[in-house]
């Protein structure tokens, strides 16, 4: 069963009341259904695979992985050779990152489910200790797996492009948003 990012009329109404331009976009675009990956390890793999490649390439590779592995778990990833993982279209470096993360999880060196008990900053700090994971990947995991609503990834190119289009700015700065508890809902249509 496909799961989607959870938000409702309350969040949309709040945003529309706070920002005229955003209200116009929400009225024009309508309800956005954005898939989430509730399995944290699968979401981690998804995030690593999607780094610095086109959306189309990411979707193609992700479909291959899902078709072959079914449920994506550390055990299933470790059971494959590097070459088998690369055949999905994953680069050697990303395969290394994914397998190292799977190994750390299986060895108990990294408690992926413990992330739920951490603040956003702590999640970023913990995930950034894994090879190949930085702030962007951690933010994507918090947003599209953990469904944390107060995430706005300023470094995400799609979000920057969307903000530029809505607000007609050349440069997007990382200034506080007056309705921070709803940041994720602002950008769902941009991703």
Predicted regions and their residues:
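Intrinsically disordered, low-complexity, charged terminal extensions of DNA damage-control enzymes
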Residues: 1-37
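Alpha-helical scaffolds flanking conserved acidic
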Residues: 9, 39-43, 79, 123-124
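Alpha-helical ds-nucleic-acid-binding substructure associated with the helix-hairpin-helix region
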Residues: 21, 25, 53-54, 58-131
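Alpha-helical scaffold segments that form or flank carboxylate-/histidine-based iron centers
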Residues: 37-52
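Catalytic DNA-binding helix-loop module of base-excision-repair DNA glycosylases/AP lyases
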Residues: 119-164
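Short, charged, surface-exposed loops that flank catalytic or proteolytic processing sites
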Residues: 169-176
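Conserved small/polar residues in nucleotide/adenosyl-binding loops
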Residues: 180-187
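Cytosolic catalytic cores of cyclic-nucleotide second-messenger enzymes
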Residues: 191
